[in-house]
Amino acid sequence: MKLNEIRDNEGATKDRMRVGRGIGSGKGKTAGRGVKGQKARTGVAIKGFEGGQMPLHRRLPKRGFNNPGATDLNEVNVGRIQQAVDSGKLDPSAPVTVEALVAAGVVSRVRDGVKILGVGELTASLTFQVARASKSAVAAIEKAGGSVTQSLAATDGAVASA
């Protein structure tokens, strides 16, 4: 016996029932769907319809809103920036800007700017020009001998908000 000769025992598996293949098959004509009505048609389920009962999405109260004026900042940890410096993708002598982070592949598709967060180790002395930085990030950067300049105007084409 070879691998390509392996098969189930005779009668071990039944063929699946193919519906709508003539009345002689026993599952022809209505194909197990009964007679007429919405459930006999294709595309049966109307999403969110609960048979006339008030649907869940209308029973629950409306909450919150999406603020169109909110600043959407990309968050980057100092540990990730240190990785980019160690791998040679980020020049430690040049200031760390949005453009430099995008070029190094640390962030992509920057919206309103970059916020530096303090997770991870930073050993390189870097100068940052970013929209925002957390207190822990500023502490880590200054501990490593670097400096931080924060302003939303320093972002890529974004308008500073008051």
Curated annotation (Swiss-Prot):
An example Gene Ontology molecular-function term: rRNA binding
Keywords: Ribonucleoprotein, Ribosomal protein, RNA-binding, rRNA-binding
Domain of life of the source: Bacteria
Gene3D superfamilies for the chain: 3.100.10.10
Keyword Phosphoprotein: no
Gly residues bias (residue ranges): 21-35
Record GO biological process: translation
Region Disordered, annotated ranges: 1-42
Biased amino acid composition, Basic and acidic residues: 1-18
Pfam families, A to Z: Ribosomal_L27A (PF00828)
One Gene Ontology cellular component annotation held by this UniProt entry: cytosolic large ribosomal subunit
Quaternary structure and partners: Part of the 50S ribosomal subunit.
Family: Belongs to the universal ribosomal protein uL15 family.
Protein task: Binds to the 23S rRNA.
Protein name: Large ribosomal subunit protein uL15
Organism: Methylobacterium sp. (strain 4-46)
Name of encoding gene: rplO
